[in-house]
A protein has these predicted regions:
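Periplasmic-binding protein-like
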Residues: 53, 131-138, 224-261, 283-297
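A ligand-binding cleft/hinge motif common to bilobed small-molecule-binding domains
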Residues: 96, 112-122, 171-175, 203-241
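Ligand-binding clefts/hinges and TM-proximal coupling segments of bilobed small-molecule sensing domains
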Residues: 28-31, 43, 85-88, 164-188, ...
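Extracytoplasmic small-molecule ligand-binding "clamshell" domains
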Residues: 33-113
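Bilobed "Venus flytrap"/periplasmic-binding protein-like clamshell domains
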Residues: 49, 53-56, 65-80, 136-195, ...
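Short helix-initiation/N-cap motifs at beta->coil->alpha
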Residues: 88-99, 148, 185-200, 204
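Acidic, polar ligand-binding/catalytic clefts
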Residues: 88-154, 238
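Extended ligand-binding regions for polar small-molecule ligands
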Residues: 72-82, 141-144, 151, 159, ...
Length: 297
């Protein structure tokens, strides 16, 4: 059962959406959050951190117009541990973040980014992931007693909404099928479609399950602003696992990436990471990560 801290999440949702609208309209933002005083600027290397402005609870702009979210909070801990740098947090769009980190406009980017071979060629992936994104199955409420995981879904011969091959979910189902050759889920590749369409297909009976990101399910079904909120009693959801997300570093910032890994290990050992997980997710999300998270995602 999902236990996100909705009091905090809903409080910032409206602000996050407004910020996202502004980003779409102007292609960027004017606000830059700095972690120390301008007087020190000349003596320190500036580290520019780009982040999405509307991805609650990972990275967003909060009600106080400050950069916030789990991934941002981890990088603010990094900033505190590396006083030789001056960190600037810059909310922006997906495209600007990816292009900017690759080109050197930004040093680091966080957006709930999964590991892919294509991205590995463009960015430095540190040893340690920064967060994780939960994926699971959305299905009809009437099947709640029958579907408890992918294995039980496969035994029912359920029809899964097609998945784009480049999506992480596709690779996860492929891995499940390799591990369960006698009880596979029929995996059909698809072209991209609007996420909210899949929920309608489930209710229509066209498909029996939608293997999707938990936040998509929450935003479409459980939030009052969701398209299917009024039909929420007709849906059920079970978690499968969490896919690691990474901070993306510019190719020239290997030293900074190495320092990130050292600080991450200290944060884990001290319990600070778990503290932040409970604050932003309401539970230990890393427990749902299987393996090291590497491989094609």
């Amino acid at each position: 059962m999902m236990k996100y801290n909705w009091k905090n999440v809903l409080a910032v949702a409206a602000v996050s959406l407004l910020t996202a609208g502004l980003l779409a309209g102007c292609g960027g933002v004017k606000k830059v959050e700095k972690t120390d005083k301008p007087a020190d600027a000349g003596a320190k290397k500036v580290v520019k951190v780009a982040h999405r402005a509307d991805s609650v609870p990972y990275c967003f702009i909060n009600k106080d117009n400050q950069s916030d979210g789990f991934e941002v909070a981890v990088l603010k801990e990094l900033a505190a541990a590396l006083p030789q740098y001056k960190f600037e947090f810059i909310p922006t769009s997906d495209d600007d973040l990816l292009i900017g980190v690759e080109s050197g406009k930004y040093d680091i980017g966080v957006k709930g980014a999964w590991y892919t071979k294509a991205r590995k060629d463009k960015f430095i992936f540190p040893k340690h992931y920064i967060a994780a994104s939960v994926i699971g199955i959305t299905f009809r409420k009437e099947d709640e007693g029958k579907i408890k995981d992918l294995e039980s879904f496969a035994k029912l011969k359920g029809k899964l909404v097609p998945i784009a091959p480049q999506n992480a979910q596709y690779a996860v189902v492929q891995q499940y099928n390799r591990e369960h050759p006698d009880n596979q889920v029929k995996l059909v590749p698809s072209e991209n479609f609007k996420v909210d369409e899949a929920y309608g297909w489930i209710l229509e009976g066209r498909y029996d399950g939608y293997f999707n990101i938990e936040l998509n399910h929450i935003n479409n079904v459980e939030k009052e602003t969701g398209k299917y909120y009024k039909l929420r009693d007709k849906f059920a959801y079970v978690r499968h696992q969490a896919i690691p997300t990474y901070a993306l570093f510019n190719k020239k910032d290997q030293q900074l990436a190495d320092e990130y890994d050292k600080v991450w290990e200290k944060l884990q050992k001290s319990g600070k990471l778990l503290e932040l997980e409970n604050k932003y997710f309401g539970f230990d999300i890393f427990k749902l990560v299987k393996g090291d998270g590497k491989g094609e995602r």
